[in-house]
């Protein structure tokens, strides 16, 4: 289910999902939003927060995850499972959870007969490509992915075109 959260939340990374807190839910005129800065770049100058409207699908997914496994401290999702962890200890805990998540994705791919390397990052790629295929401007996709500049998004999305070409070539 974390994979679905990642997809519906614009391809949010595992570390960003893990670090989300209830305090990052903001009420705005047109509904509730998750507002956060990517862990990867949050300390860089001029980084804008990403705002994700909480749709009924997102609300249901979060509710299902919280019902299945209790959250600790102020974390929004039950990825962090130990209370009171901070700093290096928290980082190592999240890394261990990430490794377990990746392992289960590999097992799921095997069970379903999926013939490519299924990772947590696939949901980010899938979200970006779905947006591009639906003619969403790259400037908007860039903002949704939290990229610092449009060039990063262009490189990111153009690399997918090569992946599609390579997959198509296998059919020949």
Stretch-by-stretch model annotation:
Residues 1-14, 18:
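Basic, Lys/Arg- and aromatic-enriched nucleic-acid-binding interface segment
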Residues 40-42, 83, 145-170:
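Catalytic-site neighborhood detector that most strongly recognizes the C-terminal catalytic loop/helix
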Residues 19-64:
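Conserved tyrosine-mediated DNA breakage-rejoining catalytic core shared by Y-recombinases
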Residues 24-32, 114-116, 136-155:
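Short, polar N-cap/turn motifs at the start of nucleic acid-interacting alpha helices
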Residues 6, 97, 120-121, 157:
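Residue-level marker of regulatory loop/turn positions in helix-turn-helix DNA-binding domains and
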Residues 55-115:
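Active-site/catalytic core of tyrosine-dependent DNA strand-transfer enzymes
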Residues 102-143:
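Short, basic (Lys/Arg/His-rich) helix/loop patches that form interaction surfaces
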């Amino acid at each position: 289910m974390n994979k679905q959260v990642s997809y519906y939340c614009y391809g949010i990374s595992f570390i960003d999902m893990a670090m989300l807190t209830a305090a990052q839910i903001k009420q705005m005129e047109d509904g509730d939003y998750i507002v956060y800065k990517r862990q990867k770049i949050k300390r860089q100058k001029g980084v804008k927060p990403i705002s994700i409207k909480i749709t009924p699908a997102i609300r249901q997914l979060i509710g299902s995850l919280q019902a299945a496994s209790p959250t600790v401290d102020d974390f929004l999702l039950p990825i962090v499972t130990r209370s009171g962890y901070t700093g290096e200890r928290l980082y190592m805990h999240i890394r261990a959870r990430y490794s377990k998540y990746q392992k289960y994705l590999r097992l799921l791919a095997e069970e379903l007969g999926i013939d490519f390397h299924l990772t947590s990052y696939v949901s980010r790629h899938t979200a970006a490509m779905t947006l591009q295929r639906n003619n969403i401007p790259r400037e908007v996709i860039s903002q949704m992915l939290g990229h610092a500049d449009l060039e990063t998004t262009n490189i990111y999305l153009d690399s997918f075109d090569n992946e599609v070409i390579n997959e198509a070539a296998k059919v020949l």
